[in-house]
Amino acid sequence: MVQADYHSGLVDAIREEGHTRTFGEGEKAVTVRLAEAFGFCYGVDRAVDYAYETRTQFPDKRIFLVGEIIHNPHVNQRMREMGIEFLYPAAGKHGIDRFDFSGLTEDDVVILPAFGVTLQDFERLKQTGAVLVDTTCGSVLVVWKRVEQYARDGYTALIHGKYYHEETEATASQASKYPNGKYVVVLDMDEARLVMDYIEGKPGALSREAFVEHFRDKASPDFDPDRDLARIGVANQTTMLSSESLAIADEVGKSLARRFGSQAGFDIDEHFRSFDTICSATQERQDAVKEMMASEEGPPDIMVVIGGYNSSNTNHLAVLCAKHTITYHVSDAACIDPESGTIRFKPNGTPFNTPETTAEDWLPEGPISIGLTAGASTPNNKIGAAIELILTARGLTSELPAGEPVAA
C-alpha cells in the first residue's frame, strides 16, 4: 500500500540514468538533476508503514495520531483519508497538559509520531489504557539516550534545536527521568553564544534575570544558570544543520575550558561531553546537496526543494541550496502552476509559518538545468509530480517508455 501510494516511475527512471536526464532539445531543453539522496528516509518510511499496518490490524477501532506522523501535508492528508484522527496540542500551549487525552479509552489505538512524544505525554497516554503504536525514529531514540545519560551523570543537556519542535520537546523531556536533570535549548550559534558569554562572565553578557527570561520556554523548570552551566553535554535535534551542531559543540567545549581551565586538576571531561547525534539520513541529504553544488557541472540554474514548510530538515536543505543558486522551497508539487507560469514558495530561512510568496516567469528562456531535492518526509510521487509540472511549463513531457507509470 505504501509503495502504491508514494511511488514514482519518473523518479526511478532518472535515478537509473545517474540522477540526471535531459528532456527536450535546443532552446527548450530542461536538464533535471536529482540529488544523490533525497525524500523518504528509513525512519519516515517505517513510521508511515506502521500507520498503514495499524489501520489494517484495527479496521474497526478508533485510531488517533498524536500531532502529525511526519511533517508532510500530503502524507498527513492520506492518514485522514484512512480515518485516522489527529490530536493537536492547544494553540501556543506548552507543558504536560498541552494535549487533551481525556476522550481516549482502552478501546482506542494511538499512534505516536516519528518525532516521539514527551515523557510526560507518554505516561498520560499509558494511563488511558489505549493500545499505543510507537513509531519513534531510531535516530531520535539515540539522542534521547544521550540526554538521559547526561541527566544521570549531572550534566545539563544543551540541545541545538527548535524548542517548539515536537522532536526537541520530546528529547528535552528525557532529562526529567532524573530529579536534577536539566536542559537548555539553543536555536543557533548566536543563541549558543548567549550561553557561553554567561558561562565566562563576559562584558555585555545577559544578567541572571535576563538569561532566565530569555530562556524561559527553552530551559527546564527552575533552571538556574549560575548552578546549571558548569557541566554541559551537547545534543541536537536530528534534523538541524550538522555543520552548525558540530560548531556549537566545539565552541561550548572551548568556553568551558576558558572558564574552568585555570582550576587545579582541571579535566575537560568533568565539565563537557559531546556526541554527534545528527541522523545519518539528514547528513546524507545535506551532503548530497553540497556535492551537487560542488560538482564539475556546477550548481543547477534553479533548485527546487520539496517538503513541508514546518519540516526542519527541508528548511535546512533550502538554506544550503540558496547559498549557491536560486532556490524555491515548495510544500507540494501543486505549488508549480504551468498555466500561469508561477511558483508559490516559502522564502528561505524564514519561520515555518511565513506566508507563501509567488514568483512569476520563474523559468528563464533557453536551455536550463533544474536541481531537485526533498526533505526526509517527502514521498517520491510528489517529486515526480513536480518534475512533470516543470516540464509541462516548458511544453515538454517526461517521455517515459510505454507502460512505465508516473505516479502524481
Where are these regions (language model features)?
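The feature marks the mature, well-folded catalytic cores of soluble enzymes
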Residues: 1-408
